Structures are given as structure tokens and as C-alpha cells.
Design a protein with these regions (language model features):
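Glycosyltransferase catalytic domains, chiefly GT-A lineage
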Residues: 1-158
Length: 158
């Protein structure tokens, strides 16, 4: 669920030179990216391993030549089954902290690091709720300070 006020947040956050806004997650990329993904994308370095992984479910893109190129690159990597599938890595052993592969999320994170893409701080979360069905169960125990909380209350009370 997205708050209607996200439009003004994005407009105020993105500079004229930026073409995307990506949401940074809390997990390290090395914990949720299989080794073959790093190797086949040319990203098998500590800068990629030790960065926080992005959340691939929520992102904002401006339609520009550069964004189309980046998204096409993302799609092409996603079409390579050796990179996207959960199959065990064959080119090298997994990193010691590896837990699971996050597929398109792992690929997007590697591309964002490679291309130096814009990443939002946690303020972005004030305007989104990924688990809005669950939100209605837990909202009486929330502080309700986010913009999205106010919007969801309006919907619930309508």
C-alpha cells in the first residue's frame, strides 16, 4: 500500500539528475546473494558483499534513456537462470554467512552498486506498507506516526 503523499516525497527527494529511488533494506548482500550471482555479474568483491541489500519490491523510476538501460540490464540478468535461480552455486563455494538467495533483489542490489544508483534513507518507509493486511491486525499497538499509517486509518474508518 502506498500513501498518496509519496508523490511529493519523491519529487522533493530526487534531484533532476537522478532517475531512480531505491529502498535500502537491513540485510547484508553477502547473506542473501549466492556466489554464482556475484561471479556471473562481475561483482565478486567485498564492496558488493558488504553492502546492505535493497528491497526490490518498492522502487521509483523516471522514464529516461538511462533508467531504461538499467532496467533492461536488470531484466537480462534476471533471464540468466544461473544468476536468478535458487540452485546451488557451481562456480565457487558460497560465502560463509550465506543464508539464501534473494533472486531479483540480489541482482538489483549488485546493479545499484555497479551503477551508483540513488538509495533512499528510511524516510521512504513512512509512505509505504508492504504488509498492509497484517497492518490492520497490529495497528492498535503501533505508534501511528507514519504518513501511511494515517492513510490506512482513513481507509479503515471509511
Amino acid at each position: 500500500m502506498v500513501s498518496p503523499n509519496i508523490k511529493s516525497y519523491v519529487e522533493n527527494t530526487l534531484s533532476k539528475d537522478e532517475f531512480c529511488l531505491l529502498l535500502l533494506g537491513n540485510n547484508q548482500n553477502k547473506d542473501y546473494t549466492k556466489k554464482d550471482c556475484f561471479i556471473l555479474m562481475g561483482c565478486d568483491e567485498s564492496d558488493y558483499w558488504n553492502s546492505n541489500q535493497l528491497e526490490a519490491g518498492v522502487h521509483v523510476w523516471k522514464a529516461t534513456e538511462q533508467s531504461i538501460k538499467v532496467v533492461s540490464n536488470w531484466m537480462n540478468f534476471c533471464l540468466d537462470s544461473r544468476i536468478i535461480k535458487d540452485d546451488k552455486s557451481v562456480l565457487s563455494e558460497e560465502l560463509t554467512s550465506f543464508k539464501a538467495h534473494r533472486n531479483d533483489q540480489s541482482i538489483l542490489t549488485n546493479i545499484a552498486i555497479m551503477e551508483g544508483l540513488s538509495v533512499s534513507n528510511q524516510e521512504f518507509r513512512n509512505f509505504i506498507e508492504c504488509d498492509y493486511d497484517y497492518w490492520y491486525e497490529r495497528y492498535p499497538n503501533s505508534n501511528l506516526g507514519r504518513d501511511i499509517d494515517k492513510f490506512l486509518i482513513k481507509i479503515k474508518d471509511a
